[in-house]
Structure formats: C-alpha cells, structure tokens
Amino acid sequence: MEKFPQLKLVNACLIFILSMHLIVSSCAQKSFLSSKAAYLGQTSPGNTPKIFAPGMLADSGIVLGKVAFSGDGKSFYYSFARHWFDDNGSGTKEIRFDGKKWQKPNVIAEKITNPAFSPDETKLYLGAGGGQVWVLNKMGQGWSKPQFWLEKNYGLYNFQEANSGTFYLGSNGIQGSKSDWSTYDFCKMTIAGTDTIISSLGTAINTPAFDGDFFIAPDESYIIISAKETPTYESELWISFRKADESWSSPRSLGPKINDGLAHRFGQYVSPDGKYLFYTRGTGEQDCNIYWVRFDVLLNSLKKEMAD
C-alpha cells in the first residue's frame, strides 16, 4: 500500500496552483505590454527610430544614457543630467503606472545613473563615474536608498547582470589605468564572495580605443555595442552574436535608419518583451534625446543573415 497518498495529492495541487499563478502572471505582463497604456502611452514606432516620450522626461537639462523597464512594463527608469560629462545635477528617475495613469517622474538617486535590473528585479544597479556600482534594493512597492555595492581599482562602466548571474561591463581590469578610458574593453565578470574574475570579450568586438557602451541580451545570445567611435564621440550601433564556443561574431551594423549620420549613440537597451530598442542619440547636448525603434523584426532578419 502506498504511504501518505494525501501528501502526494497536496503537493500535486500546490504545483498546479503555482504553475497557474506563473501562467496568469506571464499573461498579465504580456497583456499590459501590448496595451495602449504601455511605454508611457506612446504610439509604438516602426522600423524608423523616433524620439521617445517627447516633452515628458526632461523638465530641465537633458535625458540620456540607458533606460530600464520592469518586467511587467509598469515601472520606467531613466537618467538625467545638465551636461554629458558632468555628474553635478545628474541622477535617475522613476515613473510608475498606478493602474490608471502614469505618475509624474520621481528622483530615486542623485549623481548615479544608467539603471539596470538584476534578473529577479530585486536590485537596481546604478553607476557613478565609471568606477563605482551602487544598488537599490526592492522594498515592498518601492526601493531602498542607494547603497554602495562595488568598487575596484579598475573601471566598472555600464554594469549589467545576465540571467546566468554573469556580469557584463566596460572595463580596463585587464589593462591600463582606471582613468585611461581608451583602454576600456567589453568584458565579463564573475563574482563569488569577495573574489572577482574579469576577462575581455575578445578582439572580435573590442578595439584599441574605448569600448564600454553596450547592451547584453539577458540570455547572452547577442550584444549591441557602440562601435566606430570617433575622438569627438560619434558612434554607431552594431550587433554581435555569441557563438557555440562562447566567442563573438564579427559585429555588423544595425542599418542606416538607426545609424543615420554622425552622432553619439549610447545607452542602448532592449525592452522586456524584446520588441523595441531604446538608445540615446545626439550630435551634442542641444539635440540629445532617447529614441526607440521596432527591434524584434530587425533582430530576426540579422539572425537569418548570420545563419545563411
């Protein structure tokens, strides 16, 4: 006779309930992200980039750098500043959807920027000066005050965590001095307690100049980099795919509609549903804006070209 059949039944019921909860939560997220209220209620772009939420984000100064949406699409984070290369007057803001409308922007951090979620969204990483990582910890429906999290004797720029727990960053941890931006490479880092191991992503995507502005896909299948950067910071957005041996393919351009003439392009980010690419574009501070463009179709076509 089977022992404790009731216990097996209870466990089966719990597993079923949890599975249904995950399915319902996933459907709810997808439902909101496809609703008219999603993305601050903005009309979705096609394959031609357009300014995201014009007039809604900057009350003074400029908006720039990486943005981040929560997985359910109901919280939006972005950076602001007075000038490109001055952290005075800079910081990070949050806009939340309250169930009926998007609330007004709220400052959640000062002088630290470039928000990036941990995979479980319990942490929001922010950077300062290219060499420090700060973190906000999830507390109920809000966030803790910024807490200092990591600093090394080398650069920790554009810090992002993939689903695997591997961190990606722009860094000169394998060469040069912390203040020498020309020695920064696209790198990955593993952290175990107080031990860190950092390595370059290789010569396929790195150059002898500064390499630090990027977006890594959560599953690490591709990386979007700011490439061909000039001494006056003009750059283009290119993509590289990770190979089976964990090396990277030769980068290729995201095309003339995104790389339309000389401009500084950085802060690249792909939305949680994979549909849209966000990035900052400007020829100077006077025309610096966050843009967005449909990305999933472009990504699929680039993958197909790589496979052919």
Annotated model-derived regions:
Residues 29-308:
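Short, conserved micro-motifs composed of acidic
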Residues 1-31:
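Bacterial Sec-dependent N-terminal signal peptides
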